[in-house]
């Protein structure tokens, strides 16, 4: 892979992610250090025997975009023809894993389809350079979750937690209109909204445009499903900004 050939074009959402979806995690980023972001990026370029590093970056007035690369060991099965018989052989191989993250001017860190290993490496690098409390968790309060649901075309499922019931602490409601079910209304007052899955209008509010299916978690983790068509990157970023604007700051990550 040549770094010069890498271009920042956002996450592609091909048909292959239709079932699993593509994730976006929103965090708060506040720097207590005077070190410029450009210097930090230069120091963390992927080189030598580094297991994680930045391979490309781009800057706009609103944000700085980065592509990073790490390596992971996975088990792969290959077939081998031996003495007229097909054998399955398990091998451990090292594979590259690319991730994308954006640092907004207003102090939001967006992780696009970022794996756990990548997130750990990024968090360590940021805290080492900008302070131990520079990255904080964002959280959606119940009213914020309700506000997002009112904007949805259709809510397909909703999960409650912290119900305080002696027999169950969590409950999930599904169906054509789960928020209007009698049981949901009875439990929602005492519990917190853990997550919901809904359809939102995609694009410029054109009714002919296929809706965007999103699962929203209260810890500001989003998962987008394209349905029959890929979800445009611009729609993903617009929705992520809407969520970050109404999120509250929580504990240090």
Where are these regions (language model features)?
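C-terminal interaction module
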Residues: 162-253
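Intrinsically disordered, low-complexity polar/charged tails and linkers
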Residues: 1-107, 115-182, 238-253
């Amino acid at each position: 892979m040549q770094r010069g050939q890498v271009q920042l074009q956002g996450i592609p959402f091909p048909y292959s992610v239709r079932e699993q979806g593509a994730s976006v995690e929103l965090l708060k980023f506040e720097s207590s250090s005077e070190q410029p972001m450009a210097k930090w990026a230069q120091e963390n370029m992927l080189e030598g025997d580094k297991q994680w590093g930045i391979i490309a970056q781009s800057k706009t007035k609103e944000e700085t975009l980065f592509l990073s690369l790490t390596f992971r060991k996975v088990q792969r099965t290959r077939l081998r023809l031996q003495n007229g018989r097909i054998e399955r052989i398990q091998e451990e191989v090292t594979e590259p894993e690319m991730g994308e993250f954006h640092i907004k001017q207003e102090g939001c860190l967006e992780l696009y389809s970022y794996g756990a290993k990548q997130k750990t490496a990024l968090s360590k690098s940021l805290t080492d350079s900008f302070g131990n409390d520079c990255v904080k968790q964002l959280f959606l309060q119940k009213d914020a979750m309700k506000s997002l649901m009112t904007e949805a075309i259709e809510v397909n499922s909703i999960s409650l937690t912290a119900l305080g019931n002696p027999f169950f602490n969590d409950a999930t409601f599904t169906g054509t209109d789960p928020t209007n079910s009698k049981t949901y209304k009875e439990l929602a007052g005492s519990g917190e909204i853990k997550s919901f899955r809904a359809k939102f209008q995609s694009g410029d509010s054109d009714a002919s445009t296929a809706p965007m299916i999103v699962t929203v978690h209260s810890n500001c983790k989003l998962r987008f499903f394209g349905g029959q068509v890929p979800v445009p990157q611009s729609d993903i970023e617009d929705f992520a900004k809407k969520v970050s604007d109404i999120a509250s700051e929580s504990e240090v990550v």
